[in-house]
């Protein structure tokens, strides 16, 4: 299948080109030419299928023309070596727990899939080395770094904002070594993202080394996130609650909700979506006004959503032909300051004995306030609460158990290189490699 750029000024690309390049030549994001609806019999029997089988059927619709069936199946089955259970929190609100992978965050799905797909293309082409640049506000760095760890022919550079990532998150990508290098940038997440984008646009740098991105701008990162929306629906169907399903997605860079919207286009029976923001509510403001006005990000306790200019908004706009009315018809918004996020975490722990992380709390609250009669809500619980241990403990007034997977990272020694937010320094560093 061919991929086109959201800016419509670049040549169409094959899947391999889209994955290896990451960003189109005109700075646009790649979109598949077609989103194929899955047959009705798939939805009729979806509740009898396991996660890996469902994911393979979805992956085949996107990637089947470009990747041999046995290879694609192996990539999907290797990626999803963990469960994504749907857990009942209240009578009509369920949590889709996306934190059972190696780094306890939803990004394990996209990170692991992309690492395996890129590895396949590199082997196929006999390429020597591909360099992956990834900007992170926390979970992306750990998921991508761990997904790519030890993959031959790939070196990963993780750029993260100094002092703005929790210690647990930082340890997950600064202690790995091997083919992973952590760069500690004296700036914000938006500065890190700007450095990555500038690197792709620099001709001299791209002649010096093969670069690609592992942020959700890469189709191999964001499309696999559609897998768990289908699996969530399958589990809801098993529970006899699949009627009017509403999915709420805590949203930062908007890759996650975009994957869900792709699922809806493939026929997934979701009534509507809610995009839940923290104070960085650029999308919420767009829904209210019809004007997209990016602004510098503000630090909040839901730090993975501290994004002032969400990259994937371009994909949402493209999907709906630029129509504000069409977007508003399928997606509503919610926005919460830290006080309300904390209050929700405290109440849900007290009333339901369910521990939310700050991002999941935004999702739960939007459903609690926005579900209509007869609807069933699913919110995406995107990371394990222990990844935000200090914040969560302060809010609920109790100790949070750290899973063994995280404890193992905490025992590692941090190794990172300091970097200014100026592109010339970053370029000089990469040119010296």
Go through each PLM region and give its residues.
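PLP-dependent amino-acid enzyme catalytic core
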Residues: 1-433
């Amino acid at each position: 299948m061919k991929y086109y750029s959201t800016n419509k000024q670049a040549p169409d690309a094959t899947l391999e080109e889209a994955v290896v390049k990451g960003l189109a030549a005109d700075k646009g994001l790649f979109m598949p030419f077609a989103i194929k609806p899955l047959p009705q019999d798939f939805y009729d029997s979806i509740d009898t299928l396991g996660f890996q089988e469902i994911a393979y059927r979805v992956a085949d619709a996107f990637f089947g023309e470009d990747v041999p069936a046995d290879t694609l199946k192996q990539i999907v089955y290797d990626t999803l070596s963990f469960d994504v259970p749907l857990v009942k929190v209240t009578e009509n609100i369920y949590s889709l727990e996306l934190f059972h992978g190696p780094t306890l965050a939803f990004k394990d799905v996209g990170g692991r899939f992309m690492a395996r797909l890129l590895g396949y293309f590199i082997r196929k082409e006999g390429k020597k080395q591909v360099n992956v640049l990834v900007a992170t506000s926390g979970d992306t760095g750990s998921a991508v770094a761990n997904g790519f760890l030890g993959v031959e022919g790939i070196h990963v550079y993780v750029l993260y904002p100094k002092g703005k990532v929790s210690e647990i998150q930082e340890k997950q990508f600064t202690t790995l070594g091997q083919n992973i290098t952590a760069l500690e940038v004296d700036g914000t997440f938006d500065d890190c993202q700007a450095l990555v984008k500038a690197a792709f646009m620099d001709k001299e740098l791209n002649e010096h080394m093969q670069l690609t991105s592992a942020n959700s701008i890469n189709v191999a990162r964001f499309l696999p996130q559609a897998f768990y929306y289908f699996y969530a629906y399958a589990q809801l169907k098993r529970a006899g609650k699949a009627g009017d399903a509403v999915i709420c997605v805590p949203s930062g860079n908007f890759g996650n909700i975009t994957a869900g919207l792709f699922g809806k286009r493939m026929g997934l029976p979701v009534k509507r979506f809610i995009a839940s923001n923290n104070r960085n509510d650029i999308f919420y403001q767009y829904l209210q006004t019809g004007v997209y006005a990016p602004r510098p990000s503000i630090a909040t306790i839901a730090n993975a959503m501290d994004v002032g200019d969400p990259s994937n908004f371009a994909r949402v706009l493209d999907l709906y032909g630029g129509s504000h009315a069409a977007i508003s018809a399928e997606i509503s918004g919610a926005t919460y300051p830290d006080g309300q996020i904390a209050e929700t975490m405290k109440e849900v722990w007290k009333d339901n004995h369910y521990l939310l992380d700050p991002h999941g709390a935004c999702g739960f609250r939007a459903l609690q306030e926005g579900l209509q009669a007869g609807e069933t809500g699913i919110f995406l619980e995107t990371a394990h609460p222990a990844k935000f241990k200090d914040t969560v403990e302060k809010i609920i007034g109790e100790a949070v158990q750290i899973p063994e997977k995280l404890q193992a990272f905490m025992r590692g020694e941090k190794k990172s290189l300091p970097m200014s937010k100026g592109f010339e320094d970053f370029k000089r560093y990469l040119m010296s490699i």
